[in-house]
Structures are given as C-alpha cells and as structure tokens.
C-alpha cells in the first residue's frame, strides 16, 4: 500500500509510489490506481522488461524450430527482393536450430555447420538482412565489423572480441553463447594487400583472416570478460565455437572485373579481337562467382574453405528501390510520414516522385543506402518551415520537386497555397 503522511504543519497528504517508495515530490508523475500508486520511473522499468521479453523471438513453429518458410516470411516483411539470399539464410538458420536439437540426442553422425558468405554491391541489403535476422531468432546474435580487427598484439580489436560481444548478447551465459550466430560485416576489407604472401606483415588483412580461421572452424577460445588489453589480470572465460554459425558479408568492390576477366582469352597485335566492356549489372556478374575469384581478390584459401555456402545479392533496380521506399513495415516514406504526422500534417508522394528518387539512387550507385540522403535533401526546407506555419494540412511531393524545378505543394485547411507551385 502507498504511504500517506502529514509532515510538519503541512495539511496536504504526501503520496508515495507503491513499488519503489518514492514520494510524489521525487518523481515527475504519480499515477493513481484503486488502492495503489505507481510513478513514471516504475512504468518505464516495466516497459523495458516487456520489450526484452518481446525481443526473444518473432518466429516459432509447433516444434520450436522455425521452418525456412517461416523465417523467410518474416524477412519478406522487412527486406525487398534478394530472394536467393533470403532462401540461403533461412535454410542456414533452420539447419542451425536442427543441429542444436540434434546435439542432445546420441548419434554416430556429427552434423557440421556450414558458414555463409554474402556477396553483393553496396546498399543491396546485406547488413540489413543480418539486422532483421537478429530480431526474429531466439539464439544469441551479434554483429562485428571486420575493419576494426587486427592481429593479436597490435592496436585494434582482437578476434576474441567478437566472441565477447556474443557473450554479452547472451548475458554472459556461456552455454547460450555457444549456440549463437555471428555476422561479420565488411569482410572484403581484410583481403590480402598484395598477391605475394607474407612480404611484409599484414596485420589488418591476411593476419586477421588467419586469426579468424580457428574460431570459425571450431576451437575453445579464451575470452576476457572485460576486454583483454585493459585488464590483463582478469580470469578468462572458455567458449567453444564449434557450434557458433558464422555469416560473413562484404561488397567486394572490383570482384566483378575479376569474374568478367576469368575465361576470356586476351590477344595482342593486328589480329586481336576487340571485346566490349561487360555491361551486365554487378549482381548478374556475381552469379558466376567461383571460389578462385575470391582467392584472386585477396582472401586466403583456408578462409574461403571455411565459408562453404556463398550467396550473391543483386544490385537493386528502380522498381525494387520504389518498393523499398513504400512497402516494408519501416519503409522510408512511412518514417517521414510519421515525422510529419507529429506536426499534424499529412505527407504524400506522387508515383513519379518515388520513381525520380529511385532513379537518383541508381545514378549515384549507392543502392538503398542513398535513398535517405536524397529524401533528406528534398524535405529539408519543408521540415525547416513547417513548425512555424499555421493551418498546413498536407504537403505533396511531385516529380518536379525531386528534380529541383518546383517546390512542395502546401495544402491548407481552408485554401491551397499556390505559392508552392511556383518554380524555384
């Protein structure tokens, strides 16, 4: 029960939170129930607990192992296109669950894991696929950036820090961490800097690949709970990485040229055949990817051998980018409409405006990542003016606005502002 007291000569009753015991003067808000009170801080704490519970899993089947179709159905809600890559990831995660379930049964056959390499041009959804995957599975999941890794003993992060992040995601439960999934982003940035091995020490390239070999294949890693270099005297945790699934992703800029050059016999002199530049899209070229191309790019054979499943992603065309703008649950257009809704203003886009935005992103060759910067530039002036304008009911964006030849149309509650149509 909440406490009520008469302090000194004050005739007013002081109310207290029934959960934490703080008085009404110590908190911003005290909410009254039939016989109890709760403060705003306790409400926030309860919401955090509920959010953590909801994060545990979004997909589960009757047997506790989500089917590939169930995983892909959730990925489809957030990620547009990339059907092949989503199928590969869905099957890999499903098999990961099955392998963990199989471990508890006595069997002569040991199921080995199949680590995955995602290859695709920038802005096609590699990292976003991994982030979405993290939300829908109920095993510990962590993402690591390969560009920050260095060989042991040099300034930078050790590869053991990846396992430390997985441990943190599992709340330092070693058993759960040993069943987790790790996504290593920007793995193309640790390619060998020279075709000739070991001329000089390559601590952020080949050295990192070699350091990753054992933890990707399976070893007992000694992980410092607080980071190894700042606290050398701490006790190490032993984590077996045999059952941790590793997914690596990278843009591999220039790999398409290596693939195109493979198999083409070049000749010189007057009888040489003139070959046109490969005009196919990068995603189409990546479909012909072979492990030998990755070796020429700078990955060492042992590293490629530990990534048996290779999934290639396509570069996004105009139609796919328009879908990305409008269809996913957290689509960019929906995000900006929510921002404008906070100002009690409706934001709408003409179809030609969406296609013009998508065309600009294709020209910049930045994929879906470039859509936000284009939208920000288009809506910047409007977002600057809107809070000080009164009576605006709707803002309409046309194709001319995207091209820069017109200003957004402001529709007021009682009249239309013709000024919005005047050419800039």
Curated annotation (Swiss-Prot):
Binding site for Zn(2+): 17, 20, 39, 42
S-adenosyl-L-methionine as UniProt keyword: no
InterPro entries linked to this entry: AAA+_ATPase (IPR003593), ATP-dep_Clp_protease_ClpX (IPR050052), ATPase_AAA_core (IPR003959), Clp_ATPase_C (IPR019489), Clp_protease_ATP-bd_su_ClpX (IPR004487), ClpX_bact (IPR046425), P-loop_NTPase (IPR027417), Znf_CppX_C4 (IPR010603)
A GO BP annotation: cell division
Pfam family, one: zf-C4_ClpX
Family matches, as CDD domains: RecA-like_ClpX
GO molecular function: ATP binding; ATP hydrolysis activity; ATP-dependent protein folding chaperone; protein dimerization activity; unfolded protein binding; zinc ion binding
Residues binding ATP, per UniProt: 121-128
GO CC, one annotated term: HslUV protease complex
Residues annotated as domain ClpX-type ZB: 5-58
Keyword tags: ATP-binding, Chaperone, Metal-binding, Nucleotide-binding, Zinc
Assembly description: Component of the ClpX-ClpP complex. Forms a hexameric ring that, in the presence of ATP, binds to fourteen ClpP subunits assembled into a disk-like structure with a central cavity, resembling the structure of eukaryotic proteasomes.
Function: ATP-dependent specificity component of the Clp protease. It directs the protease to specific substrates. Can perform chaperone functions in the absence of ClpP.
Entry similarity comment: Belongs to the ClpX chaperone family.
PANTHER family: ATP-DEPENDENT CLP PROTEASE ATP-BINDING SUBUNIT CLPX-LIKE, MITOCHONDRIAL, ATP-DEPENDENT CLP PROTEASE ATP-BINDING SUBUNIT CLPX-LIKE, MITOCHONDRIAL-RELATED
NCBIfam families for this protein: clpX, PRK05342.1
Protein name (database record): ATP-dependent Clp protease ATP-binding subunit ClpX
